[in-house]
């Protein structure tokens, strides 16, 4: 265990839900996966933990961990998804704060609780190389031999006309086609809209014959528990034949995240998905959101979606790769427990695909 540097301190499980959301919105890198609602729905209230790091009494970093333990032995994992959060909204981010918060996380979950700690920080391959050094110096190694997933991030600080001009020619043409049709946009955060979207989403999944990457019903439950200012944005597009497309986006910090998209069978020719994305960008611009994360690309396994997102991002879109997951552990029992649990989960997943 390494003490935090002078002036820094940490607190664990000392905040309630309302205070957590107040702190969450102070960080530019705040996101859906660090919301209380997400952790509670995914793991249950007893299986989430909240850590604060302070400098001279002022909160400068936070992290929500999801805790999974093996029965009887008490060993297991603490997982920080898209965290910790350490980039303030109104000030310049300091890499030293990142160092202190991952040290505090390791002290609590590895040294005190004997768990395997795995973090998935919002760091990309084009960020400063200092972060890899900090992770290594603080006792973290890359989780397995995995390479981080890719995504495209749009800079929304540019004028709207520049963003439109940056769209690739194919995307611009499809958007113009959609704008000439009599399409109606319905938007909000209500459960009724979520229900309509799910019906369309399930229809698309059945048509394309692919396995859902995320449990959308779980996200509906999360939506019901999120406070108003953190709820997901739902946008639906209606043509003369009914609902033709929809999307769900999350905006908690300075980056909007595209979570789900769907197109109905009857809406295949409406180009509604193009219109929705553009209307969403207009809405994000009005809210002064700085970035739009198109949330995952894979040219090999999903070339169609990759092309859609690449053309939307245009020439100015950042095609980036996450640094990946990093972990630290001092307990052989926790390492073994997590390894067995993940193997069983992988086997179960393979059986479901057959």
List PLM regions with ranges.
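Aromatic (often tryptophan-rich) hydrophobic motifs at membrane interfaces
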Residues: 79, 96-107, 218-335
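Short amphipathic alpha-helical interaction patches enriched in hydrophobic/aromatic residues
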Residues: 88, 205-209, 296
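Active-site/acyl-donor-binding loops of N-acyltransferases
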Residues: 1-9, 14, 67, 135-161, ...
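Glycine-rich, N-terminal phosphate-binding loop and its surrounding beta-alpha-beta segment
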Residues: 59, 63, 75-123, 127
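A conserved beta-strand-loop-helix scaffold within acyl/acetyltransferase catalytic domains
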Residues: 6-56, 60-74, 121-126, 131-149, ...
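Conserved beta-strand-loop-alpha-helix junction that forms the acyl-donor binding cleft
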Residues: 119-129, 294-303
């Amino acid at each position: 265990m390494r003490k935090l540097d002078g002036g820094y301190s940490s607190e664990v499980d000392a905040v309630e839900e309302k205070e957590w959301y107040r702190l969450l919105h102070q960080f530019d890198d705040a996101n859906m996966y660090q919301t209380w609602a997400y952790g509670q729905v995914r793991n249950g209230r007893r299986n989430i933990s909240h850590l604060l790091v302070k400098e001279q009494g002022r909160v400068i970093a936070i992290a929500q961990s999801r805790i999974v333990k093996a029965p009887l032995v008490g060993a297991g994992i603490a997982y920080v998804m898209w965290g910790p959060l350490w980039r303030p909204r109104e000030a310049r981010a300091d890499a030293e704060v990142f160092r202190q918060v991952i040290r505090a996380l390791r002290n609590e979950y590895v040294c005190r609780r004997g768990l395997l700690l795995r973090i998935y920080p919002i760091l990309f391959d084009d960020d400063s190389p200092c972060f890899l050094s900090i992770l290594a110096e603080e006792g973290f190694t890359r989780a397995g031999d995995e390479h981080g997933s890719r995504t495209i991030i749009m800079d929304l600080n540019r004028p709207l006309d520049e963003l439109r001009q940056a769209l690739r020619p194919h995307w611009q043409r499809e958007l113009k086609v959609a704008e000439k049709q009599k399409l109606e946009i319905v938007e909000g955060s209500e459960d009724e809209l979520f229900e309509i979207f799910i019906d369309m989403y399930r229809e698309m999944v059945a048509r394309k014959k692919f396995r859902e990457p995320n449990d959308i019903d779980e996200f509906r439950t999360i939506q019901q528990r999120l406070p108003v200012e953190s709820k997901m944005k739902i946008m639906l597009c209606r043509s003369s034949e009914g609902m033709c497309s929809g999307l769900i986006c999350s905006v908690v910090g300075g980056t909007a995240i595209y979570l789900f998209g769907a197109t109905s069978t009857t809406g295949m020719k409406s180009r509604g998905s193009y219109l929705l994305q553009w209307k969403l960008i207009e809405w994000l611009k009005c809210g002064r959101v700085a970035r739009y994360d198109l949330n995952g690309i894979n040219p090999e396994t999903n070339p169609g979606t990759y092309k859609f997102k690449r053309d939307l991002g245009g020439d100015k879109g950042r095609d980036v790769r996450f640094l990946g997951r990093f972990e630290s552990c001092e307990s052989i029992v926790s390492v073994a427990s997590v390894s067995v649990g993940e193997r069983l989960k992988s086997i179960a997943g393979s059986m479901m695909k057959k």
